[in-house]
Amino acid sequence: MKCGRKRRRRRRHACKRKKRACKQRSSTIVRAHLVHRRRAARRCP
């Protein structure tokens, strides 16, 4: 049921704190998010 949601949330909050880093990382976060979703789709019912 929990498909690694906690990690995603943590990243988002950290991003809010460091707004400068957010712009640089945004593209990588999106990529990682998509990759993780594909992996999680196999595990989760």
Swiss-Prot record:
**What domain of life is recorded for the organism?**
Eukaryota
Q: What is the reported tissue distribution?
A: Testis.
Output one GO BP term.
cell differentiation
Is Nucleus there in the keyword field? yes
**Region described as Disordered:** 1-26
What Gene Ontology molecular function terms does this protein carry? DNA binding
Q: Could you tell me where the Basic residues compositional bias lies?
A: 1-23
Q: Which UniProt keywords apply?
A: Chromosome, Developmental protein, Differentiation, DNA condensation, DNA-binding, Nucleosome core, Nucleus, Spermatogenesis
- Where does it sit, as one GO cellular component term? nucleus
Where would you find this protein in the cell?
Nucleus; Chromosome
Any keyword Magnesium? Answer: no
Q: What's the stated role of this polypeptide?
A: Protamines substitute for histones in the chromatin of sperm during the haploid phase of spermatogenesis. They compact sperm DNA into a highly condensed, stable and inactive complex.
Name of the protein in its database record: Protamine Z2
Per the UniProt record, the source organism is Scyliorhinus canicula
